[in-house]
Amino acid sequence: MAKIRTGVIGVTAGGLAATTLAVYCIQSAPGADALVAGPPRAVVRVDQVGYAPGEAKQAYLMSVEPVSDASFQVRDADGNEVLSGRVGASTGGWNNTYKAVQTLDLSRLTEPGDYRVEVSGPVTAESPTFHIAPAGELFGKLIQDNVRFFQAQRDGADVVPTALQRKPSHLADRQATVYDTPAYDADEKVLTAPLKPVGGPIDVSGGWNDAGDFLKFTHTASYSTASLLFAQRTTPAGGKELATEARHGLDWLDKMWDDESRTLYVQVGLGKGDTDDGSGKIRSDHDDWRLPEADDALEVEPGDPNYLIKHRPVFRAAPPGQPISPNLAGRVAATFALAAQLDAADNPERAHQELEKAAHIYALADTTPGDQLVTAFPHGFYPEASWQDDMEFGATEMALAGKALDDSRTADWTGQAGHWAKQYLASDTLGTLGLGDVSALAHADLAELLDADAPGTEVTRGQLADDLKRQLDDGSSRAARDPFRAGAVYTDFDSVPHAFGLAATAQLYHRVTGDSHYDAFATQQRNWTLGANAWGSSFVIGAGTTFPHCPEHQPANLAGALDGDGDILRGGVVNGPNAAEKLKDLNSFPTMRKCPTAQGNPFAAFDGHGGGFMDHVGAWQTVESADDFTATALLSFTLSAAPQSAETDPS
């Protein structure tokens, strides 16, 4: 996430290098690996959640030098040895301390239970405990935790009090004023003109806070809601709570679309004011560190600097009835159409209404957009260049809903889906699954339509499968060169959601083609996000034994536990490793609770290949959690847990 807050501070006078000298006396810091006198000579990194019985399973030994005669033993919960083997060949060095990473093949371990790995020989090390369990059991809990994160993100009156002691918030959103598009300077740091009211009042209360802040975006909410609905359609593993949370997201999107005036609203709240430090006449959401209900308690009048923090502005995608940026039109239409598919059997009346809204939104798509798509204000919060994938997604889901409801427009929508798929394949904005690219979801569902011999489409099922393969080949090529087999780029933002996106795409590819070639790659990507990485941390809060305790998230910091136990932001997915050089400056507010309580960064000893990780409340670069991050992870876990996702023999 690139929503930079004001008030940055340095880590220490000596930066990251200085923190490394201090961490070896810190035994209570998260991820410290019980460092006492210096870095351990070797560590074992493993997926701390675990593996399904039939998956390929790898752990990693990271040591100060390659070892050729080391062995490993796997022990069960009673300490009995159940598996042994030799340490594999080195996959490469990591940093100046750890010059070798070697694989430990655990694939023969298939009996459900709790296990740990011990390495003996020239170096010794022991892994955290991990589990072997059926896919539905293993990933079902992770899905439920992801849903809990969304419960903690709720805004408005319908909050979940057991999630971080949440209280109703931003109730003034029930009577919100609509403003014209805000004007920012060239660097998108400050407003250059007062906001101009153009409409309202309208009710935009509810929904989810976008990340660790309190802004709400149609761009991210539609992606997250569509992902939850896709997951709900895929497997019952998420249960009633997943369905309820998906409906919560859809209900807010319904408020953001005025079907009568044909107006799509895209944002609630102001992310940047008229100064970069919050000292001006117009202050923004990012200028204070507080609980969301504190905004409701503000006593303000028009013209007060904090007026727009309580009485939050609403911005439109376009004036009423005018063409809408196609990325938004396609994605929001897809979300309503997914809901229509789920409602078709039990609530056909509501399903027809949802499909009509999808069709109305889709019909307003501006298919000759300018250089900048509408995502957020300022645009730099969520830059995006791809839109043909969104149009394919919208048409595909409308066609599937049309099939379920026997709608006469189904063939036309199928044709449009094929058209936009072809345009996407010919574009120069090809990406992989995540907030900025939904082609993998669109391709997988369009392939289902083509399986039904849909006439008149401009693409073939094989072309769609080839593009899924293209996305996976990009990641698997990187993984083949990475010591921990990471397919994501961990020197830039969104490394963890990117890894989850690759894992989900591999599952979709298997479903479309029946080809299990990328199954092991998918498992490796999930393993990396859950602890089988250089830092030995899971990047899903509450998953595994070591995970972020100090996310940059205001309710988690101000109302939650800071030691990883009790009331935490369970299920939230963080950005994960980023370029180490980006961690020199952290966010700071006087009202932040200090986290961690000890000085230094115990993870710095494990930085390498340009990547760094820090668990610090001010480290938005690595531990800010976000709705879209978590939605992508939930989608990946769902596809892994689904009964139709056949486990393959690791041999």
Task: Give a label for each model feature.
Residues F130-A135:
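Short beta-strand edge segments in extracellular beta-sheet folds
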Residues A329, A333-D343, A351-G402, Y424, ...:
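Aromatic-lined, polymer-binding surfaces characteristic
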Residues L242-T263, Q267-L270:
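Carboxylate/His-rich catalytic cores and anion/metal-binding grooves
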